[in-house]
Amino acid sequence: DCPWDWSSHEGHCYKVFKFATTWEDAEKFCTEQARGGHLISIKSTEEVDFMIKLAYPILKANLVWIGLRVEDFWRDCHMGWRDHANLLSKPGVVHNTKCFGLDQKTGYRTWVALRCELAYHFICMSRVPR
């Protein structure tokens, strides 16, 4: 089972954190909260729907960090989730942005490229402990 204050969905635990921080600090915080924890990676529309139901009533924030980041931008523009899940599609990357979030203006359904040093709320996820 998930920790008492986390929500369970499809074999994962999720928790919305209502304080704003940089992408790196949010990812580090998630790894400290649960074994195998990371910023949320989104692999299906069902997971998006669950995340919206979970996050929107709590946050009502314009932007929320997700676990997507461009690594080694100047060499090969490798893009991937922090938990190494497969990336189903690639959003457009804007020069000077390496991190991604979800935008409330689109119902948290659009990935937006953001500067990693800005501070936003975030959602952590981990596998359900065995």
Curated annotation (Swiss-Prot):
Its main location: secreted. Disulfide bonds join C2-C13, C30-C124, C99-C116. PROSITE patterns: C_TYPE_LECTIN_2. It holds the Pfam family Lectin_C. Expressed by the venom gland. One of its GO terms (molecular function) is toxin activity. GO terms for cellular component: extracellular region. Keywords: Disulfide bond, Hemostasis impairing toxin, Secreted, Toxin. Residues 9-125 form the C-type lectin domain. It is found in: Secreted. The keyword Flavoprotein does not apply. Coiled coil: none annotated. Shows greater sequence similarity to the beta than alpha subunits compared to other heterodimer snaclecs. Heterodimer; disulfide-linked. Interferes with one step of hemostasis (modulation of platelet aggregation, or coagulation cascade, for example). Belongs to the snaclec family. This is Snaclec B8. It comes from Macrovipera lebetinus.
